[in-house]
Every structure is written in structure tokens, then in C-alpha cells.
Amino acid sequence: SIYVNFKLNNIPAVFAEAGVDLERAYVLIWTTTPWTLPSNTAVSLGPDIDYCFVEADGKFMMFAKDMVEAVAKVAGWESYRIVETNGEPVTMKGDQFGDITYICPVLHENTGRIIWGEHVTLDAGTGAVHTAPGHGVDDYKVGMKFGVDTIMPIDDDGRFTDYVPQWAGLTTDEANPKIIEWLRERGTLILHEDINHSYPHCWRCKQPVIFR
């Protein structure tokens, strides 16, 4: 899995008034499938989850308040703070982030939207979920609900098309480490860690399923 900063284009006024600097403001996303990042068009939040900005390493990063301690630990932040007003953390529910957009750092630097969906949990990650409607049922459903674009750079053979010229012809497994390195070189990768998690496989050939 990887934790990646997406640069925010704008932020809710309540956070700006609390001192969040837009020039250093990001949404910190989490995903177990780096190869789907070229298809990113949204970041999903949980509608009833509280989100805050954390200042660390010279950046303001927005993600779920209840995940701050866990993220700080795995990211190795020696010093961090939750943005506050009058001694109280400034928070906002996921379904209150209207008209907030960001720049996806992979390749074409597409503009994406902050949206929300019931599928977002706090079991792992940041509570801010990379969303690619072209890959996966949950992503597709929430993408259609909010009318975000669907990008599909994977062909019938499971290889990247010319939409992503740097990785055209590569399988998703071959592209994964290259995408991670791309993010690391650009300073947007916060953490890369190996985890064990369930993933659907074809019952006939026993290979991982690629959703398109």
C-alpha cells in the first residue's frame, strides 16, 4: 500500500481561517493498488467521518482525524500538530467538502474532485481513498453518483495503453514499482509498505482480477 499527497487547489474557508496555507495544502490518500492511479478522478471521504489538517514535514495534510496517530506512527513524523482554533481541532464531516478539487500527481496531472461514499472506512489508511471509477465496483458506483470522469488506460490484455506513454505495454504488476518510484522522485510519496490483504482472483486461471 502507499500513502500519497495530492495537491489541493482550494480548501474550505474554516481551515483557511485556522491558518492552513493553501500553497502547502494536500489531501493524503491511501491505496493498495498503485497501478490504478493513472485512472484517478476523485478522492472519496466517509460522509460521517471527521477530517482535519495535520501540519508535518512543512506540509498541511488533510485526512481522517481518527487516523492521525496511526498515520503519524507509520510515516515516522517526529513532530506534527492538528490544526486548531482556540485549542480545539478544526474538523469537518466528509460530506461537507463541496467543490474541493486537487491535482493528481501521476502523469497528466488531472484535476480530481473530493467526493464521499459509504464504502469509506477507517479500518486502514487515511480515510481519504483514491478513487478510479474505471476500476472496481465501489469506485464506479460513487463515481457515477457524483458524475466524475472514468479513465481506462488498460487494454484487453491487461497492459497499459499509450494514454500513459511512460508505462505503455507494461502489465499492472510491472507498472506498480515504476509508479511508486515516479511518486517518490516527485516528493509526493509519504510511505510505501507491504501489507497482506484479500483480492479477487479468477476461479479458473487463479490470476488476480483486473476490473475495467
Where are these regions (language model features)?
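Residue patterns forming the tRNA-binding/recognition surfaces of aminoacyl-tRNA synthetases
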Residues: 1-38, 51, 99-103, 109-111, ...
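Protease-associated
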Residues: 42, 49, 53-128, 137-141
